[in-house]
């Protein structure tokens, strides 16, 4: 702390009684021990110690411990209720999971059955359509074969007349004379067989 000269004293205060203090020491009247360690006060200290601990014990026994015991009992009851409820909820959850898994298995089974039925229906439908198409194709094939045989028969009739005309033209060109139609027809028939 900064002290200005206005606050500072020029001279020390005078000592009353003419004594000056020149040493440090214990005053003559202050001899003895610290009171709690004085053996003369031990009996009263022990009495108050016993009274204090007795009152403290009664306070703990009558007030603090019943409250603490009640709190512990309430907490134990709450914990047991929570455990019971958790066990109940776990059972319900397990039952729900089992029901879900059973429904899932049934759904898979039903889906498999439905898929098989759809595949069988599609196969039967395809078989029916194939049979219809085969019948239509067989009918068209029969018609085509009939037309082909008709065309072939007509062509064979015409081939005979074409062969007769061609043979007649060849005989005329080679021999220079005409052959009769009966002779040419007989020659064509003999070659065709």
Swiss-Prot record:
Residues 13-32 are annotated as: Disordered. GO terms for molecular function: proton-transporting ATP synthase activity, rotational mechanism; proton-transporting ATPase activity, rotational mechanism. The chain crosses the membrane at residues 40-60. Pfam families: ATP-synt_B. It is found in: Cell inner membrane. Its main location: membrane. CDD domains: ATP-synt_Fo_b. It comes from the Bacteria. InterPro entries: ATP_synth_b/b'su_bac/chlpt, ATP_synthase_B_chain. Keywords: ATP synthesis, Cell inner membrane, Cell membrane, CF(0), Hydrogen ion transport, Ion transport, Membrane, Transmembrane, Transmembrane helix, Transport. GO terms for cellular component: plasma membrane; proton-transporting ATP synthase complex. It is a single-pass membrane protein. Belongs to the ATPase B chain family. F(1)F(0) ATP synthase produces ATP from ADP in the presence of a proton or sodium gradient. F-type ATPases consist of two structural domains, F(1) containing the extramembraneous catalytic core and F(0) containing the membrane proton channel, linked together by a central stalk and a peripheral stalk. During catalysis, ATP synthesis in the catalytic domain of F(1) is coupled via a rotary mechanism of the central stalk subunits to proton translocation. F-type ATPases have 2 components, F(1) - the catalytic core - and F(0) - the membrane proton channel. F(1) has five subunits: alpha(3), beta(3), gamma(1), delta(1), epsilon(1). F(0) has three main subunits: a(1), b(2) and c(10-14). The alpha and beta chains form an alternating ring which encloses part of the gamma chain. F(1) is attached to F(0) by a central stalk formed by the gamma and epsilon chains, while a peripheral stalk is formed by the delta and b chains. This is ATP synthase subunit b 1.
């Amino acid at each position: 702390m900064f002290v200005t000269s206005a606050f500072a004293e020029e001279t020390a205060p005078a000592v009353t009684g003419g004594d000056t203090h020149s040493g440090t020491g214990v005053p003559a009247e202050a001899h003895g021990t610290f009171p709690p360690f004085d053996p003369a006060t031990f009996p009263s200290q022990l009495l108050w110690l016993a009274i204090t601990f007795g009152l403290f014990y009664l306070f703990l026994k009558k007030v603090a411990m019943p409250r603490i015991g009640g709190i512990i009992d309430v907490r134990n009851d709450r914990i047991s209720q929570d455990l019971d409820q958790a066990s109940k909820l776990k059972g319900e959850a397990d039952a729900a999971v089992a029901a879900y898994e059973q429904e899932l298995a049934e759904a898979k089974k039903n889906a498999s059955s439905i898929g098989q039925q759809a595949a069988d229906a599609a196969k039967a439908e395809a078989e029916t359509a194939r049979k219809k198409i085969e019948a239509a194709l067989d009918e068209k094939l029969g018609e085509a074969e009939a037309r082909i045989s008709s065309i072939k028969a007509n062509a064979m009739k015409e081939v005979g007349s074409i062969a007769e005309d061609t043979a007649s033209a060849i005989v005329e060109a080679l021999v220079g004379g005409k052959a009769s139609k009966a002779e040419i027809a007989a020659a064509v028939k003999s070659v065709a067989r």
